Amino acid sequence: MQNNTKFKAYIMLMRLHRPIPILLILWPTLTALVLASHGIPDIKYLIVFTIGVVVMRTVGCIVNDIADIDFDKYVERTNTRPLTSGKLSVKNALYLCLALTIIAFICVLFLNLYTILLSFVALFLAVLYPFCKRFFAIPQLILGLAFNFGIFMAFSAIENQIPLEAWIFYLSTICWTIAYDTIYALADRDFDLEIGIKSSAVLFGDKVFKYIFLFNFISLILLIALGIYLSFNIIFYIGVIISAFLFIRNYFLYKKLGITNCIKAFSDNHWIGLIIFILVVIQYL
């Protein structure tokens, strides 16, 4: 029984019981693979990048819980996490984090030297984000850089370069990430204000909804720019319009505030990532 409890604690530490953030990282990465391949990517890249996304997401979660262990106990949503509640020790977490990092590095060894070098930047960003909440006003920006860095790695792995379309798509996904993680941060804003944690939801204050709209809008404009640059057909732009309607639908959900509404609005963003992925695949059929 004790082993079963500890196993569940490890699952919670790695957030494997909540797969939506994995999808939020995976869809842009897979989309970048399709863009770089000008069609369906080689199975090797699909396997390596999918494993890499899952593993690095879990590494980020573990580092986050280690960094926030003294803060999480004051936040209603996080005070039952394995490290905060004592179900696992920091030593347990560090060993797991090291093992997962080694797995990620083994995966990247199947790629070219350029991508291997970029993987160190990806690791740095993943580790940096949890600590930014102490000193950086918009840690969601760092999260956007980290979550979507797989875009650069996808292009470097296949094309051995980072072309203009990669930059356009990367900037679009960063804006998208800032928007949806600001929604997520709304769930904890009152607690963050009390304990001095920084977030875009805290920084934007009463204008937070306007800023979420702004970042979503910029994200869509950059997607349109990507479509124009790559000469995509009308189907792509119809999908962008559908994404805009989903952003509007989410607005009426997260505007109600409350943990449940904010988490639901945050989670629903993965459908937008899926839509863009499907639209890009269609362009190369």
UniProtKB/Swiss-Prot annotation:
EC number: 2.5.1.39
Pathway: Cofactor biosynthesis; ubiquinone biosynthesis
Co-factor(s): Mg(2+)
GO BP terms: ubiquinone biosynthetic process
PROSITE patterns, alphabetized: UBIA (PS00943)
GO MF terms, alphabetically ordered: 4-hydroxybenzoate polyprenyltransferase activity
Keywords: Cell inner membrane, Cell membrane, Magnesium, Membrane, Transferase, Transmembrane, Transmembrane helix, Ubiquinone biosynthesis
Subcellular location field: Cell inner membrane
Catalytic activity: all-trans-octaprenyl diphosphate + 4-hydroxybenzoate = 4-hydroxy-3-(all-trans-octaprenyl)benzoate + diphosphate
Main location: membrane
Protein topology in the membrane: Multi-pass membrane protein
Gene Ontology cellular-component terms listed: plasma membrane
Family: Belongs to the UbiA prenyltransferase family.
PANTHER family given in the database record: 4-HYDROXYBENZOATE POLYPRENYLTRANSFERASE, MITOCHONDRIAL (PTHR11048:SF28), PRENYLTRANSFERASES (PTHR11048)
Function: Catalyzes the prenylation of para-hydroxybenzoate (PHB) with an all-trans polyprenyl group. Mediates the second step in the final reaction sequence of ubiquinone-8 (UQ-8) biosynthesis, which is the condensation of the polyisoprenoid side chain with PHB, generating the first membrane-bound Q intermediate 3-octaprenyl-4-hydroxybenzoate.
Record-given protein name: 4-hydroxybenzoate octaprenyltransferase
Native source organism of the sequence: Francisella philomiragia subsp. philomiragia (strain ATCC 25017 / CCUG 19701 / FSC 153 / O#319-036)
